[in-house]
Amino acid sequence: RQSLRLLSDGNDSXDIRHLSRLLDNLGSVDQQFRQLRHSDSPAENDRMGDTRIAALETGSFKNTWQAIRPQLNLESGVFRHAVRLSLVVAAACTIVEALNLNLGYWILLTRLFVCQPNYTATKSRVYQRIAGTVLGVIVGSLVPYFTPSVETKLWIVIAGTTLFFMTRTYKYSFSTFFITIQALTSLSLAGLDVYAAMPVRIIDTIIGASLAWAAVSYLWPDWKYLTLERTAALAVCSSGTYLQKIAERLKTGETGDDIEYRITRRRAHEHTAALSSTLSDMSSEPAKFADTCNPALPCSKPATALTGYISALGHTAAKCTKNAAPTLPHSSTLPPNTPPTSSNTCPTWDPTTFRRHWIHCAANSAPSAPAAAEHKATSSSNSSNSSPGSSNPTTAPTDKFRTGSPKTQPEKISAFW
């Protein structure tokens, strides 16, 4: 490093800058190797174990049963879907065998592909399946006219099968379109009457799609409005637990992400995402539930905002704790021998000011003129009563992050929470 420093004096060339950057990278690699040398120590392993979230191992039968057992009840959407799927598949097989349908397996395949765990996904699949089948039948009926040779039909079968697997995960209507062309072309190669199979294909698709729609509508339907109250309660409670964990870390001055804190943080985000997904699914449920769904739709925005503000508070608390110094700006107001924690260095708001600003932020609108004047007067009063060396605890955040027009009244949000 000294030789490179002497060489770079008065010589600012690109080669010297590249050598300096390479030397820094080599030093970083050397430091990582030095840390790996001591990574096998028990203390290091214990510390690393505290920062990981253990996943449930399913390699043995015991662990597999522990993962499956909580789902064996009607409150589990997975269990309801499994029972629903089994019953409708049995009904489809019974219809095919009783009526002795030649191509009746198309009903079973439609039923298996279309039926989804919830009403919204099944409804979308029903429309896509019928539309793709009808268009595929129209295009497939033209194949014998333009492709009389066997080689061309084989290429169409290969292309249709390949495109089916390429599009089945992100655009189901396209995959249905391609597989219908492939099926009709395969029947033409087998020497069967394609034009006699076309109406059968459409009828079987409609029967299978109707069975799938009836199953999700009447066999333990997964109407989201039935679980909305519980989902919202879980979102609020998990966010409250997350906030409580942050407050405890502020009091103790803890900086590490232990496993309990990470689990609490993950659950808060998962429950908030579940609430948003529930409200999104409710918007596409039948119109007869509109009276229940419409008043609940504005709940997603304040719930997401609440979790976001708590996450920002946790990040700020970690930075305050990390940067806490033994000599604090207002250490004269603390009792003797008080440890320097982030709760002593972070600014605080009184409950009224915090509640007012949270409501305005959740509504995505700037505070009104009277509220701003009142907050300014409160800030001036608190700053005049504070010590000369202390920071202003009531400084309001800037409005540069508030964008968009208000969509929800602050009073309604306050009443909801």
From Swiss-Prot:
Specify the protein's topology with respect to the membrane: Multi-pass membrane protein
Query: Keywords for this entry?
Result: Cell membrane, Membrane, Transmembrane, Transmembrane helix
Q: Does the keyword Protein biosynthesis apply?
A: no
Q: What is its main location?
A: membrane
Kindly list the GO CC terms recorded for this protein. plasma membrane
Transmembrane portions of the chain: 87-107, 130-150, 177-197, 202-222
The Low complexity compositionally biased stretches are 366-398
Kindly list the places in or outside the cell where this protein is found, as annotated in its UniProt entry.
Cell membrane
Write out the ranges of the annotated region (Disordered): 366-417
Instruction: Tell me which stretches of the chain form a coiled coil.
Output: none
Q: Which PANTHER family match?
A: INNER MEMBRANE PROTEIN YCCS, P-HYDROXYBENZOIC ACID EFFLUX PUMP SUBUNIT-RELATED
Family according to the record? Belongs to the YccS/YhfK family.
Please give the name of this protein: Uncharacterized protein ORF2
